[in-house]
Amino acid sequence: MARVKRGVTSHAKHKKVFEAAKGFYGRRKNTIRAAKSAVERSMQYAYRDRKVKKRNFRALWIQRINAGVRALDLDLTYSRFIDGLGKAGIEVDRKVLSDIAIHEPDAFKALVEKAKAALA
């Protein structure tokens, strides 16, 4: 039986790790031990932050909606506005609401009025 040398497979594995470590600083980009742990950690951060990104955007949309609502009516808060929209039967998600608040103030004002009417 022929002797199997592992050079080709290990070189391919190392090459894959170094490609992922491209742009890293110092030893982390050109020694396999440092690069492997750095790449593993970077993948953990990437996985975690894909989840965190969703939370951050939702928080941003809520802040924008709240600012838009309070600019139109000082007595109305974000939570009461959302409650009013629900009671009025208007189903618009927060992403669209924040976009409307920024780009179409007249339409947003109409939504605020409908929400206030539903609360009264």
UniProtKB/Swiss-Prot annotation:
Gene Ontology cellular-component terms for this entry are: ribonucleoprotein complex; ribosome
Record-level GO BP terms: ribosomal large subunit assembly; translation
One of the entry's Gene Ontology molecular-function terms is: structural constituent of ribosome
> Could you name the domain of life of the organism this protein comes from?
Bacteria
Keywords noted in UniProt: Ribonucleoprotein, Ribosomal protein, RNA-binding, rRNA-binding
**Listed HAMAP family:** Ribosomal_bL20 (MF_00382)
Q: Which family does it belong to?
A: Belongs to the bacterial ribosomal protein bL20 family.
Briefly, what is this protein's role?
Binds directly to 23S ribosomal RNA and is necessary for the in vitro assembly process of the 50S ribosomal subunit. It is not involved in the protein synthesizing functions of that subunit.
Name of the protein in question: Large ribosomal subunit protein bL20
* Organism name: Xanthobacter autotrophicus (strain ATCC BAA-1158 / Py2)
Q: Which gene encodes it?
A: rplT
